[in-house]
Every structure is written in structure tokens, then in C-alpha cells.
């Protein structure tokens, strides 16, 4: 197991409508405890949301896999609402690796539940993709999350967000425990 310390800088562009944009720079793109870039990454996206709870967006990052994938594009949409003090978010995400034609692309149907600072997420992998379950808790700027990625392993992350002048910054620690199915544990 390797332990990682990340410095993430976020730049949010002001939005005068329901469309927003974001850009981030990170020392290593970590997703569910596993490195996706094996080094620095530049990331960004565009989001649309309206008052009904509907949202949609696109997000991208550079990645570095040994099979030739050099970029990731995620397309997503969903609907979020509150019911009896519980936040509910039902969404769909497509993960696309345009430079790779060996079947890395996959999709998930995601159900997120939240109450106060406590969150629970279920991601159901489609067409044979593994499922993922995560529980998270936040206390102010401090966040902790534990997830289990079927057939890959468990991950733990601890993060802290803060302001750097006019930017939102953060530090994160991530640890991954491999279940022995060939996951890249960084």
C-alpha cells in the first residue's frame, strides 16, 4: 500500500445562470483510492443545474494507464431532492477513455443519500462493471470517506479544504487495500 498526499487547487468561474465551470490542478488524480494519472493532472468540467433538482455535466482529466489511455471524459446527469430531511440523488455516469479501444469505458447508476454531514453512496456498475459503496462524513472542512469497490478493494480517504487567496485548495490522504484482482494500488 502506498500512501499519498495530494494538493488540489480548484478554480470556480462565477455563474450568472444555471451553468458553471471548474478547473483543478492536482499532484495525482486519485479515484476510489487508485491513481488514475500516476502524477500531476489537469481537470475541468461544465455543469448545468436547475431549481427542479435536475443536473447534467461533462468532466475531463488526463490519465496515465499502461494501455494507452491518456484522457478521461465523464458524462453525467441526475436528479436530486430532499425527502423528510434526507437528501436523495439519483444519477447516471458514463466514463469514457477516448484514446483506448480495449473496453475501459463503463457506466454506473448512482444513488446518493445524505443527512446532515453523513453520506452514503451506491454505484451500480453496468454491463459487468463492478459496484461501489461508500460512506462519508464531514466536519467543517475535514472529510473522511471509506469505500468498497467490488473485485478491487477498499479505500480510505481523509481530506481537508481551505482557501488560498481567491482559490479553494485542499489536502488529501488516500489509502487503498487491494483484494488481489490486479488493481493498481497507489
Task: Give the residues covered by each predicted segment.
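Outer-membrane beta-barrel proteins
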Residues: 4-5, 15-186
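Repetitive helical segments and hydrophobic/amphipathic motifs
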Residues: 11-12
